[in-house]
Amino acid sequence: MRSAAYALSLLAAVAVLTFGRPALASHYAVADVPRLITPADAEKLKKAGVATTEDLLTKAAKTKDRKALAKSSGIGAGTLLDLARRCDLLRIKGIGSEMVLLLEAAGVKSVAELAKKDVAGLSPAVTRANQTKKITEKPPADEQIHFWIEEAKKLPVVLETK
């Protein structure tokens, strides 16, 4: 008899296949995610040499680098931290801009925070957040949330939040 963890992993894999190609931060130009980065901020970032969400995460991961980017872009360091947190979540396979907003609304702001969650606690929070904010037509199933949590546990912490 196979374990429950194996069954959940298998269901998560099926869910990923169902939801299509995984979304990764390197796949987005800053101008292509207007729900995450305003067009005005995207323009400022491009002028400061930040072309992709991956670039943004790299250049805003450390506090000192965020301060430098704030100076060169004209975007506040606090806003850059918020944007970097969003880009951090984009590193998880299957998470795109809509799911970043849903996770944020459920109280998850980074990969490190997601890695500490469990499905039993996060799934109801995601459901409540979506009922309140109406972010997506198709909220993630428990299997998808489990997959994201497991993926988050595998990724290194890159975002300095202090």
Annotated model-derived regions:
Residues 4-5, 10-162:
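C-terminal extensions
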Residues 1:
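Conserved binding/catalytic microenvironments
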